[in-house]
Every structure is written in C-alpha cells, then in structure tokens.
A protein has these predicted regions:
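Loop/helix patches that line or flank the sugar-binding groove of alpha-linked glycan CAZymes
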Residues: 1-91
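Buried hydrophobic-core signal for structured, non-transmembrane domains
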Residues: 92-96
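C-terminal beta-sandwich/jelly-roll accessory domains of carbohydrate-active enzymes
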Residues: 97-134
C-alpha cells in the first residue's frame, strides 16, 4: 500500500431497496465489504421512488429538463466568491455555495435544488442551485 488514504469512504454501494443493509445490493446473502449505515433506509431508490421532494426525483427532473433543452456548448464557467455560474446557450446554472442569499438571475426558473422561500423574494438561498432559461 502507498500509505495514502483510500477512496473507500466515497465508494459505497448504492442503496436500492429494503430497510436494512445491504439494501438490495448484490444477490443472496453476500455482504459488501464497505459497510452501509442503517440510516440509509430512507435513501434507497425504493424509498425515494414516489417522493417528489427526494434526491432521486430531483435528478429525474434535471435529466428531463436537460433533454428538453438544445445541446448548446458550454459558453462560460465563472466563479465569483461563493457563486459558481455555468452558461450553456440560453441556460444558466447558478450555485450559491455561500452562507448568504444572492440575487436570482433573470429568466424562467426551470429547476431548483431546494426551496427558495427561505430567502428574500428574488434571491437564491445559501447552499442552493438553480437552472434558469433566459
């Protein structure tokens, strides 16, 4: 071994179904060698399937939105303090990585990674991303 930390902490099997480890990962009685926390029962695909506020539902909405948009090239990527903005044609993805709300970009809101009502009107809350179509 190299003595360097491994990547095992970020390479845990996807929790598919059930209410206990291994959450539907793998056939039979085998167990993954990377442990899965018991708390993951709420994060299985099965548990998120019908929840409109789940991470799975968010990713499905993001994929549907992306398929509906033109396949333009990325025209710019900008980091300004705690804000990351990626532009692709008329689409802007703005990520507020900071701890304070920022003004929302103008345009049609296509997708938000979280509720926007936790910030003043017209602002993007902290730790939230939006897709906006100009």
């Amino acid at each position: 071994r190299t003595g360097q930390p491994g990547r095992d902490g970020c390479r845990v099997p996807i929790p598919w179904s059930g209410s206990a480890p291994p959450f539907g990962f793998g056939p039979g009685t085998g167990q993954p060698w990377i442990p899965q926390p018991d708390a993951w029962k709420t994060l299985t695909v099965q548990a998120q399937q019908d929840d409109p506020d789940s991470t799975l539902s968010f990713y499905r909405r993001a994929l549907a939105a992306r398929r509906s948009l033109p396949a333009d090239e990325v025209s710019s990527v900008a980091a300004d303090g705690d804000v990351l903005t990626v532009r692709r044609g008329a689409l802007s993805v703005v990520v507020n990585c900071g701890s304070s709300p920022i003004p929302l970009p103008a345009g049609e809101l296509l997708l938000a990674s979280g509720p926007l009502d936790g910030a003043p009107a017209g602002h993007l809350p902290a730790d939230t991303a939006v897709w906006v179509h100009a």
